[in-house]
C-alpha cells in the first residue's frame, strides 16, 4: 500500500506579517523588478510567491525570469529578489504566501 506525506499541519502555521518594497526599471524592451522582502512577524513566512501582472488586464506577465521564488523567511529575515521580463506596458507586483496576513 502507498503511504503519502501528511502536510495538514501546514494549515496550522501562525499568520505572519511581511514587509515589502519594490521598483521597476525600464531598459529598452525589457523591464527589471527588484523586490525587498522582510518578515516582520514572529513566525516563518512560508512559500512566498512573487508574481508580476499587467496593470490594465490583470494577466500574469509571462515569461518572467526570477532569480528565486517560493521563498521562506525566518522571523526578522530580509531578502532581495530580482526578475526581468520583456515588455513596456505598466506592471504591478502581487505577493502571496501560505501564511501571510
Predicted segments with their positions:
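Terminal connector regions
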Residues: 1-14, 62-66, 80-101
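Surface beta-strand/loop "capping" patches
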Residues: 3-38
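Beta-strand-rich interaction surfaces with strong enrichment in secreted/lumenal proteins
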Residues: 23-24, 67-73
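Beta-strand secondary-structure signal
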Residues: 32-36, 49, 80-82, 94
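Asparagine-centered strand-capping/turn motif at beta-strand->loop junctions
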Residues: 35-42, 87
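Short, hydrophobic/aromatic beta-strand segments
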Residues: 43-51
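Short beta-strand and strand-turn-strand segments in soluble, beta-rich domains
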Residues: 52-69
Amino acid at each position: 500500500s502507498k503511504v503519502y506525506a501528511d502536510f495538514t499541519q501546514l494549515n496550522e502555521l501562525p499568520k505572519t506579517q511581511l514587509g515589502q518594497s519594490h521598483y521597476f526599471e525600464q531598459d529598452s524592451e525589457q523591464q527589471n523588478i527588484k523586490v525587498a522582502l522582510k518578515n516582520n512577524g514572529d513566525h516563518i513566512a512560508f512559500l512566498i510567491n512573487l508574481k508580476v501582472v499587467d496593470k490594465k488586464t490583470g494577466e500574469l506577465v509571462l515569461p518572467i525570469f526570477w532569480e528565486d521564488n517560493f521563498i521562506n523567511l525566518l522571523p526578522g529575515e530580509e531578502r532581495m529578489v530580482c526578475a526581468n521580463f520583456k515588455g513596456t506596458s505598466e506592471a504591478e507586483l502581487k505577493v502571496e504566501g501560505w501564511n501571510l496576513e
